[in-house]
Structure formats: structure tokens, C-alpha cells
Amino acid sequence: MSRFVVLLMVLFSMGLTLPSCKGEKEKGPTPTGTKSLIPQSPYAMLIVESESCIYCKQLEKDLQRDPQLKKAVEGMDVLRILAESNARVKYRLDGKEGESTEEDLARALGVRAYPHIIFYNSQGEIILRIPGYTSPKTLTCAIRYVKEEFYKKENINQFLQREGCV
């Protein structure tokens, strides 16, 4: 029995450290059990995923394996919610601040395609939405568009064309 308890504690502690192995800032639940989606960095990339979405899994692989994409997300909070989840999240998005389930937030944000990437600043202003999967090259350019504040000067399509990202 004591071996089982020790094994359970070891497995639980490993589960707590796994997100940090990805090289991304995963914000887990707070002591109250609520995950915070309020960025600590100037910009955040919120990925809304679905359990059965194969493109969500591909995006996860891209974020872990593509060197340009890994470099691009440095200094940006990479956050995730699951569209079917009842887990609680605290958010500041689109001029609203509050707490809800991940599922309710995805619905309130009008997410209908997965993965759905939402870039926003630390004040919660949504800068860019990318519904559906996009290639690592295009996503890397979109991250640059946000981080280097090109969104203040031109629309995303002009930027992607000019930079040869599409």
C-alpha cells in the first residue's frame, strides 16, 4: 500500500512538471483551481483546441519541433484552452474581465474552427485571430506581426504578402 502511495505521488509530481518541459509558458491552475489566461508578457497567444482535432495535435508538434516557431514564441505567453472543458479560467479579453469555464469562454469568443489562435496584449485587446491550422512559416510571420507591432501599421494580409509568408 505504501509503495502505491509513493508511486502515485511521484506520478502526480511528474505531471506537474511536464508543461515546463515544453519550453512554453503554461499557466496551470491557481491555488483556487482556476487557470489564468491573463498574460504576464506584453503579448499572448491563446490556442483554443478541441479533443478530437488532429490539426491541434499537429500545431502542438510544430510548436515543439519547428526551430523558427520555437524562437518566435519566446517572450510571448502561449496559453491553451480546450473547447469541451469545464475547467475554470480567469481571463481579460476583448474588453471583458471575468471567470468562466474553458467551454463557455470558447463559445463567447465565437470559436467554431480548431485550432483557433487568438493573439492579444496584456490589456486583453484582441489583435489577431487565426481560425484553423496554418503552416509553421505563416504562423511564425503572424507572431512577428504581433510582437513587432506591425498590426499598428498594416493589415495582416499585406504583411504576409510583403514578407513572402504565404
Please annotate each region the language model reported.
Residues 22-24:
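Bacterial signal peptide processing site
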Residues 57-74:
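Typically the conserved alpha-helix immediately C-terminal to a functionally engaged Cys/Sec
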Residues 113-129:
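A short, hydrophobic beta-strand/beta-hairpin element that forms part of a small beta-sheet core
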Residues 18-20:
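C-terminal motif of bacterial Sec signal peptides marking the signal peptidase cleavage site
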Residues 39-54:
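Short active-site neighborhood of thiol/selenol oxidoreductases, capturing the structured segment around
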Residues 70-99:
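Thiol-based oxidoreductase modules, predominantly thioredoxin-like and allied folds used
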Residues 133-166:
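Thiol-/selenol-based redox modules, centered on thioredoxin-like
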Residues 99-118:
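Structural micro-motif
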